[in-house]
């Protein structure tokens, strides 16, 4: 066991994490040069294209060190994005060490810091690495100062390398072996294995990626998952050297996979403990929690006959993404669709993009909403994730909305504009620190404000230099109201929005004005109203199209003209009673685009 090293790589987007992983795999001969491709561990096209890692992957490598010993290195590739922070914490708890990769030309960024703190809390040894030192803009001294300043770990002897050219990659592995402790654990103790990730394979069912903490696991043994108490027979165990390779057994300290014919991904929860069914471990490994969706949105097929196809697509996606939740929902305006829950905004974008790409769906998405805690007047508390399900104002005692703590990092030139943005979004400043040229701002902001367009606005006010990460803090009582949109007196459920009272007038007026531009003129007058409960706060009219019925009366008597106009009026009135206004799909997207000016 002294020759095993389990490590992962922490880095901000585009700091070269996947490239470094590629080089390490190549150096250790995990794949022949023919099979080598860039970003080996990012298996989804979407991961490659966006340059992000979504699912955790592993590679078991053998490396002959300079001291002549052969070491087994287990590389656990972690997602770097804040939406997947729970997965990151599971991946990190399976490791003893982490390479902190920092781009020498850019310095420290928000997500690096967030994941690095997670690593330090879990007691993982962090080894700093400066990447991209072949760039003319590289400034290693500055980057080292930032690592020491912002994260507070000693970085004087940080390894300098360039993953692109392969320069210094061996030094990275050497310092990894020197600094990271070997895994602790007893191969003879009762089995305890941590599920780092799981995914669905069409041939063998669910594949679980595990780190064996104690004990030994062999094929044909019966295992039990401690969170659900379900039992299965193990069919295969093995490791990935990115390609899968079956082994006789997996023992303490190793990272590998278990295949045991599980059909449902929801059975193999990330962070759960696997143990023997016959002599189970006395207690599960700490840190397991159920992942709860934070952001909800409605997904509807553009064509009504695509509903079944959408359901199948969601089921298939759910096989590989246990944190996605969905339930059927009917909207008067959009027909049949699903209400889906996501971990965060990036997760939502990815799910939408995969549905459109891999399953050729055409989708309409409603405005993303967050979950509100509503205390009703009879004292019961309900969770409302859909504005249409919000009770009547008279039955509500108080509404609590989710508050998140946001950490923002930016160069000091942009502090003013970022603070202005946070104030607009009802944020309260908690902290502000200067680290050299970088500034760290900490804010508490209602999640609903972040969901809409905070990230895009942040990037635009800081010219792309600011980075952020957020985590849920608590539910807090707030004065939020539900604004309904009425068209000719009928509520349109899909257009309801929940906003803070201070912004309700403005948002109501904006949406109404936007709808007026979008809805085509009808043969009769259309009234668009925004209402809070029974109180109308905004109104726009769309004038009717009318034929000039007086065209054929030259001169003539006024009573004749009056008669014709009255007759036209009667007709319009009748039309209005039976006519229904078609709402074009752009109207639903318009709500999303009502920015806070």
From Swiss-Prot:
<dbReference type="InterPro" id="IPR035654">
    <property type="entry name" value="LepA_IV"/>
</dbReference>
<comment type="similarity">
    <text>Belongs to the TRAFAC class translation factor GTPase superfamily. Classic translation factor GTPase family. LepA subfamily.</text>
</comment>
<keyword id="KW-0378">Hydrolase</keyword>
<dbReference type="GO" id="GO:0045727">
    <property type="term" value="P:positive regulation of translation"/>
</dbReference>
<dbReference type="InterPro" id="IPR000640">
    <property type="entry name" value="EFG_V-like"/>
</dbReference>
<dbReference type="InterPro" id="IPR035647">
    <property type="entry name" value="EFG_III/V"/>
</dbReference>
<keyword id="KW-0547">Nucleotide-binding</keyword>
<keyword id="KW-1003">Cell membrane</keyword>
<feature type="domain" description="tr-type G">
    <location>
        <begin position="2"/>
        <end position="184"/>
    </location>
</feature>
<feature type="binding site">
    <location>
        <begin position="14"/>
        <end position="19"/>
    </location>
    <ligand>
        <name>GTP</name>
    </ligand>
</feature>
<keyword id="KW-0997">Cell inner membrane</keyword>
<dbReference type="InterPro" id="IPR006297">
    <property type="entry name" value="EF-4"/>
</dbReference>
<keyword id="KW-0472">Membrane</keyword>
<dbReference type="InterPro" id="IPR031157">
    <property type="entry name" value="G_TR_CS"/>
</dbReference>
<feature type="binding site">
    <location>
        <begin position="131"/>
        <end position="134"/>
    </location>
    <ligand>
        <name>GTP</name>
    </ligand>
</feature>
<keyword id="KW-0342">GTP-binding</keyword>
<dbReference type="GO" id="GO:0005886">
    <property type="term" value="C:plasma membrane"/>
</dbReference>
<dbReference type="Pfam" id="PF03144">
    <property type="entry name" value="GTP_EFTU_D2"/>
</dbReference>
<dbReference type="GO" id="GO:0003924">
    <property type="term" value="F:GTPase activity"/>
</dbReference>
<dbReference type="InterPro" id="IPR000795">
    <property type="entry name" value="T_Tr_GTP-bd_dom"/>
</dbReference>
<dbReference type="GO" id="GO:0003746">
    <property type="term" value="F:translation elongation factor activity"/>
</dbReference>
<dbReference type="GO" id="GO:0005525">
    <property type="term" value="F:GTP binding"/>
</dbReference>
<dbReference type="InterPro" id="IPR004161">
    <property type="entry name" value="EFTu-like_2"/>
</dbReference>
<dbReference type="InterPro" id="IPR038363">
    <property type="entry name" value="LepA_C_sf"/>
</dbReference>
<dbReference type="InterPro" id="IPR013842">
    <property type="entry name" value="LepA_CTD"/>
</dbReference>
<dbReference type="InterPro" id="IPR005225">
    <property type="entry name" value="Small_GTP-bd"/>
</dbReference>
<dbReference type="Pfam" id="PF00009">
    <property type="entry name" value="GTP_EFTU"/>
</dbReference>
<dbReference type="Pfam" id="PF06421">
    <property type="entry name" value="LepA_C"/>
</dbReference>
<protein>
    <recommendedName>
        <fullName>Elongation factor 4</fullName>
        <ecNumber>3.6.5.n1</ecNumber>
    </recommendedName>
</protein>
<dbReference type="GO" id="GO:0043022">
    <property type="term" value="F:ribosome binding"/>
</dbReference>
<keyword id="KW-0648">Protein biosynthesis</keyword>
<dbReference type="InterPro" id="IPR027417">
    <property type="entry name" value="P-loop_NTPase"/>
</dbReference>
<comment type="function">
    <text>Required for accurate and efficient protein synthesis under certain stress conditions. May act as a fidelity factor of the translation reaction, by catalyzing a one-codon backward translocation of tRNAs on improperly translocated ribosomes. Back-translocation proceeds from a post-translocation (POST) complex to a pre-translocation (PRE) complex, thus giving elongation factor G a second chance to translocate the tRNAs correctly. Binds to ribosomes in a GTP-dependent manner.</text>
</comment>
<dbReference type="Pfam" id="PF00679">
    <property type="entry name" value="EFG_C"/>
</dbReference>
<dbReference type="InterPro" id="IPR009000">
    <property type="entry name" value="Transl_B-barrel_sf"/>
</dbReference>
<dbReference type="GO" id="GO:0097216">
    <property type="term" value="F:guanosine tetraphosphate binding"/>
</dbReference>
């Amino acid at each position: 066991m002294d020759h095993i090293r389990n490590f992962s790589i922490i880095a901000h987007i585009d700091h070269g994490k996947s490239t470094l992983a590629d080089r390490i795999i190549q150096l250790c001969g995990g794949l022949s040069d023919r099979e080598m491709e860039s970003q080996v561990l990012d298996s989804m096209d979407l991961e490659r294209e966006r340059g992000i890692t979504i699912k955790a992957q592993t590679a078991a490598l053998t490396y002959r060190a300079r001291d002549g010993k052969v070491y087994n290195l287990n590389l656990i590739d972690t997602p770097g994005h804040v939406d997947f922070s729970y997965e990151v914490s599971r991946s990190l708890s399976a490791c003893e060490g982490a390479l902190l990769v920092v781009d020498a030309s850019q310095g420290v960024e928000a997500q690096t810091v967030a994941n690095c703190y997670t690593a330090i809390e879990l007691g993982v040894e962090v080894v700093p690495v400066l990447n991209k030192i072949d760039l003319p803009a590289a400034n290693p001294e500055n980057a080292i100062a930032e690592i020491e300043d912002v994260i507070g770990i000693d970085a004087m002897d940080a390894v300098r390398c360039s993953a692109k050219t392969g320069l210094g990659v061996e030094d990275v592995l050497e310092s990894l072996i020197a600094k990271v402790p070997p895994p602790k654990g007893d191969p003879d103790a009762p089995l305890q294995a941590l599920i780092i990730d799981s995914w669905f394979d069409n041939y063998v069912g669910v594949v679980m990626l595990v780190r064996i903490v104690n004990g030994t696991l062999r094929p044909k043994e019966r295992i039990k998952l401690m969170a659900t108490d379900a039992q299965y027979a193990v069919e295969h165990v093995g490791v990935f050297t990115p390609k899968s390779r079956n082994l006789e057994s997996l023992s303490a300290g190793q990272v590998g996979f278990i295949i045991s014919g599980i059909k449902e991904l929801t059975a193999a929860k990330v962070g759960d403990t696997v143990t023997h069914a016959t002599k189970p471990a006395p207690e599960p490994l700490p840190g397991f929690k159920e992942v709860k969706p934070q952001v909800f949105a409605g997904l509807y097929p553009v064509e009504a006959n695509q509903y079944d196809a959408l359901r199948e697509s969601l089921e298939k996606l759910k096989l590989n993404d246990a944190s996605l939740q969905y339930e059927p929902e009917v909207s008067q305006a959009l027909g049949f669709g699903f209400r889906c829950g996501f971990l965060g905004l990036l997760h939502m974008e990815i799910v939408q993009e995969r549905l459109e790409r891999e399953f050729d769906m055409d989708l309409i998405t409603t405005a993303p909403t967050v979950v509100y805690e509503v205390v009703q007047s009879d004292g019961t508390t309900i969770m409302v994730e859909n504005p249409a399900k919000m009770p009547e104002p008279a039955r509500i005692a108080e509404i609590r909305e989710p508050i998140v703590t946001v950490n923002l990092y930016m160069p000091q030139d942009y502090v003013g504009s970022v603070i202005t943005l946070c104030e607009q979004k009802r944020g309260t400043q908690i902290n502000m620190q200067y680290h050299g040229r970088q500034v760290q701002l900490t804010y508490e902001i209602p999640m609903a404000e972040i969901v809409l367009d905070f990230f895009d606005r942040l990037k635009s006010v800081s010219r792309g230099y600011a980075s952020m990460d957020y985590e849920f803090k608590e539910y807090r009582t707030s004065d939020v109201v539900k604004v309904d949109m009425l068209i000719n007196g009928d509520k349109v459920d899909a257009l309801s929005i929940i906003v803070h009272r201070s912004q309700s007038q403005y948002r109501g007026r904006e949406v109404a004005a936007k709808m007026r531009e979008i809805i085509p003129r009808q043969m009769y007058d259309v009234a668009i109203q925004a209402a809070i409960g029974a109180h109308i706060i905004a109104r726009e009219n769309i004038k009717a199209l009318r034929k000039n019925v007086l065209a054929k009366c030259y001169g003539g008597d006024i009573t004749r003209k009056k008669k014709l106009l009255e007759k036209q009026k009667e007709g319009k009135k009748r039309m209005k009673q039976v006519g229904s206004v078609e709402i074009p799909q752009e109207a639903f997207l318009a709500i999303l685009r009502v920015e806070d000016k």
